[in-house]
């Protein structure tokens, strides 16, 4: 009994130690399970440690009991071991099944958690992506507006610059046109140009005197020639050449060069006043009896075309063909009538019959101003109208006209044409 009692005590002590160990393990397992998803029913069982402890206890008991009791102990230990091994196998199976259940539950929880995290993260990512896209759209709109504004400003600036350049170009062209209109393209100094223009003016005056002289002699020759002039007859030489000579005497292309020179010569007409006052009134009466032949020539000028270009110092051959042969006795009163006719013009003064080379030229003209030729076409028209009026007036009215013409002649003493030709 002593050996068996010790064996029982050893077995009881072993069970207590196993219980204490198992309780500690259970506490450890409970703490572990609490930390893992709040689980309470998980149990961990270390089978190898239990087997080692059991074998140690068996060896101790076998050493204590001795050889005498070995047979009885072997039989009893074999039965206990079989029972314990069955319990261990059953516990192992239970633990494996329970652990599989817990693992499957944890796996399901993890899968749900992963799905929840994926949903949350996907929602957050989609929300952040939407915010980013809105920001990008706003930035793109702002950039588009800025670029459109820059393009608009560039176009406005370009249009303004183009308008400014166009206005500047138009202004430059206008200035160049003005310069070209007042520009004298002839070669030579100012004095030479003025001398040439003066020669042309004197030649034009000579041509006018010659035409007036020819017209007076045509009137004195007879009335047949005047009746022939009543219609348009371009076959007659005197008809066309008289108009051409009058047109060449005007010289419209030189008017702009001689205007300034005639203004400068307005101060030199004091000597012309004496000559105009000495003209007798009888000569003025003879002019009033002349027929309206110059009016016929001025009326044809609107129908004739084809200007004839010739030099300023030479006369046309038509003058010689249109002038009839008369006696020297009749030439002197014709010249006097011509002088009266020239003096009675509204825009012309008394003209001298001397050679242009014999006249004295005044050097007081400005070298920078330009010369121009007077428009003799207008003076011829006004002359013809006055001649018609003078032919129709009565003797009483002729006196009034003569007095008015004398007053007008005094006023025209300062006329640049008369001063230049004096």
Swiss-Prot record:
Keyword Iron carried by entry: no
GO BP term, pick one: regulation of cellulose biosynthetic process
Residues covered by region (Disordered): 269-422
Expression sites by tissue: Expressed mostly in vegetative tissues including older parts of the root, cotyledons, leaves and shoot apical meristems (SAM). Present at low levels in pollen, siliques and seeds.
Comp. bias intervals (Basic and acidic residues): 355-371, 412-422
Location(s), subcellular: Nucleus; Cytoplasm, Cytoskeleton; Cytoplasm, Cytoskeleton, Spindle; Cytoplasm, Cytoskeleton, Phragmoplast
Superkingdom of source: Eukaryota
GO cellular component annotations of the record: cortical microtubule; membrane; nuclear envelope; phragmoplast; plasma membrane; preprophase band; spindle microtubule
Motif Nuclear localization signal, chain ranges: 23-30
CDD domains recorded: IQCD
Keywords: Calmodulin-binding, Cytoplasm, Cytoskeleton, Nucleus, Repeat
InterPro entries: IQ_motif_EF-hand-BS (IPR000048)
Primary location class: nucleus
Reported phenotype of the disruption mutant: Abnormal pavement cell morphogenesis in cotyledons characterized by reduced interdigitation associated with altered microtubules organization and dynamics and reduced rates of cellulose deposition in anticlinal cell walls thus correleted with a reduced anisotropic cell expansion. Hypersensitivity to the microtubule-disrupting drug oryzalin.
Gene3D superfamilies, per the entry: 1.20.5.190
Repeat is among the record's keywords: yes
Region (Calmodulin-binding): 137-151
Composition bias, Polar residues: 273-308, 373-387
Composition skew (Low complexity), residue ranges: 310-327
Subunit structure: Binds to multiple calmodulin (CaM) in the presence of Ca(2+) and CaM-like proteins.
Protein name: Protein IQ-DOMAIN 5
Native source species: Arabidopsis thaliana (Mouse-ear cress)
């Amino acid at each position: 009994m002593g050996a068996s009692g010790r064996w029982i005590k050893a077995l009881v002590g072993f069970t207590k130690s196993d219980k204490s160990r198992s309780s500690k393990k259970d506490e450890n397992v409970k703490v572990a399970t609490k930390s893992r998803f709040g689980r309470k029913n998980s149990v961990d069982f270390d089978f190898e440690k239990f087997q080692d402890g059991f074998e140690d206890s068996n060896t101790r008991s076998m050493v204590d009991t001795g050889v005498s009791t070995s047979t009885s102990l072997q039989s009893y230990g074999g039965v206990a071991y079989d029972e314990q091994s069955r319990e261990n196998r059953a516990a192992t199976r239970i633990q494996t099944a329970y652990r599989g259940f817990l693992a499957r539950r944890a796996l399901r929880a993890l899968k749900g958690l992963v799905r929840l995290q994926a949903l949350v993260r996907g929602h957050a990512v989609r929300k952040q992506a939407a915010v980013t896209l809105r920001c990008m759209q706003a930035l793109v709109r702002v950039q588009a507006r800025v670029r459109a504004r820059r393009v608009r400003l560039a176009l406005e600036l370009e249009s303004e610059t183009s308008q400014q350049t166009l206005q500047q170009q138009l202004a430059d062209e206008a200035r160049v046109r003005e310069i070209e209109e007042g520009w004298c393209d002839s070669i030579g100094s100012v004095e030479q140009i003025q001398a040439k223009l003066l020669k042309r003016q004197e030649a034009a005056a000579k041509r006018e005197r010659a035409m007036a002289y020819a017209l007076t002699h045509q009137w004195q020759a007879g009335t047949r020639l005047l009746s022939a002039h009543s219609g348009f007859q371009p076959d007659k030489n005197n008809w066309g050449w008289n108009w051409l000579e009058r047109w060449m005497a005007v010289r419209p292309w030189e008017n702009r060069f001689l205007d300034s020179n005639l203004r400068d010569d307005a101060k030199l007409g004091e000597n012309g006043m004496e000559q105009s006052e000495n003209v007798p009134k009888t000569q003025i009466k003879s002019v009033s009896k002349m027929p309206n032949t110059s009016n016929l020539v001025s009326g044809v000028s609107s129908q004739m075309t084809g200007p004839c270009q010739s030099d300023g110092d030479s006369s046309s051959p038509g003058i010689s063909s249109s002038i009839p042969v008369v006696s020297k006795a009749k030439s002197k009163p014709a010249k006097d009538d011509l002088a009266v006719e020239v003096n009675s013009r509204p825009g012309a003064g008394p003209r001298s019959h001397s050679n242009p080379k014999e006249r004295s030229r005044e050097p007081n003209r400005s070298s920078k101003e330009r010369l121009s030729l007077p428009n003799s076409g207008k003076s011829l028209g006004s002359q013809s109208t006055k001649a018609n009026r003078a032919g129709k007036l009565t003797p009483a009215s002729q006196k009034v006209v003569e007095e008015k013409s004398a007053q007008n002649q005094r006023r025209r003493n300062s006329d640049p044409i008369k001063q230049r030709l004096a």
